Amino acid sequence: MELTKSEREIMDVLWEAGVPLSRSDFLERSEAKTWKDSSVHILLNSLLRKGMIKEAGLVKCSKTFGRTFLPTMSREVYYVTAAFAHRYPPAFLLVMKALLDRPEADKATLQQIQKLLNEKMK
């Protein structure tokens, strides 16, 4: 998944926080940035569409409620995936095959992987 510089900066704030954040939390935690509220809103919606973040709940923000967000993957997983996908598009399948061909991939491990795949396919 290709992210813009601003989207990566939003993700960095979220990854460093380690807790669900609201739009106003992003503004507070990004003091070095001069993002406008509307810019953060646009970036969060873009990250939602790309599947990088998910809604985690609601919090009361003054008189209204605001959504909170969590990342759908760790920073490490994002950068490894992005590096493979960018340079070697079929690399994901090759990596999976290499991992599955290892002797450590016993039947119990393969069953767990199958369960994860089945859940993902729903």
Predicted segments, located by residue:
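Short alpha-helical segments that sit at the start of domains
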Residues: 1-13, 17, 74-75, 85-89, ...
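Basic amphipathic alpha-helical segments that dock to polyanions
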Residues: 10, 41-50
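Short acidic, hydrophobic short linear motifs in intrinsically disordered regions
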Residues: 20-30
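A short, conserved structural fragment
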Residues: 48-60
